[in-house]
């Protein structure tokens, strides 16, 4: 058996490993948290049978290592809460992308800042106790009896839904939790912790269920790593799109209208319009055909598409009109297919590329709604490509290149790409899956784009490529999806007439480059911290007359900029110049044009750049050339 520990590889005979734990073989090294035993995550306390071929130790740099570290910390937090508040009930506490959370039934009590400090102190105490963490496997019935005895009803509910007869709990000191694991060997492995916040949640995310209290936290192997993370978090708070959206007057959400339904204010709408015009122009350049489709469709359409059978819980309730049932659309695809089907298509017509900025509505539980990132009404930059088998490789390559072009234009430079393959339950022949998956991989290989395989994570109707972008703080944001669909062409009987005169099924490729406008806008706000590049800025220039006697000249400058299609505002108030400059800086307007007596007499303007300062005097023509060049340069700012 091979034991891989970083760069070090050791070989063991079968007789040397039987009955021994991984920890015994690896040595007491608190830099490693979990092991992959022949590819399966296991506790370091796992006892080997002698049949294993390879054991790989994982540290905090691995995803599984981090998950294990954070999941154990969530158990430590739950233990701390139970020791301080024994009357509260535990529910679930997973590791998440950045840290962990645990939900507690507090019977209506809301955790305070002081509570979080006390829980944190108690966690440090539990860590110092160096409690061994033990995995116990037992019959489900015994586990139910155990949790009944200690009054943890949520655990019983979970157990009743587990089909397995043998389940596992993890025990540290007097605290035990139902869990699949894996976990750290000992509480002392956790070194640096911070509880970040508490908020309300609902059992299973359903507002009809019990209201819970959720505590979020983070932990690291060193204090330095924790401090670095907290610094990033502080910066992220300053960039929070919900805060900046309000400060910069970009969008709002109103209880009277409904959660997850966005109002785009004039400044937000100005940015959206720029993105829309750019998006349409670039699509028309690449032979996409722009379409528009209605917001509602008859129930018959959604029956054919399968949405009523498989997606109804995510749809808004039906409406009835003239004895017909209608639904607000959750997706644009069926409409694009109906456009395709309005005439017989020849093999010569393909590929056909329809694109639309289509607004869709999906029911998301209120507990998961989050600013612009998770909403109920949103606009997708949708396109559907109908192609012959011999065209799919080139089509995928062109879509990937197009995605990179678009995202680069907005200033993004770091990407991660994933190919999701066939899940257990799927539609479409194995041959179609193989051909489509191969086309996705070959396209990326030919473009020299590195990617990771997300095994079995494709949708049931086809494999896909996902492109995520990284922002200045290293956070990942989901953007582009390129998705094959073997389901809808069958359901709608989509065909083209091939050169042999036989009707054949085209490949259907769904793709969205930005994802949704709302989510992409949130990403842009946080990426730039509200300091949008000039071409995107809702107001590009603020004209600031120093006094009332300069307003007439300032108006001429304002009109000239307007005539040159510059998004401009003018501050005619009687405030002092410094106050006007401060206001423009707060609004993050890229350029300020200051006009006073000297500028008026010399027919010049004084130019100031946001966060940079004074650029000196120049003619209006020189200033226009300056900003037009910058706008042409796109994301440079």
Where are the model-predicted features located?
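NTP/phosphate- and nucleic-acid-binding module
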Residues: 1-91, 96-637
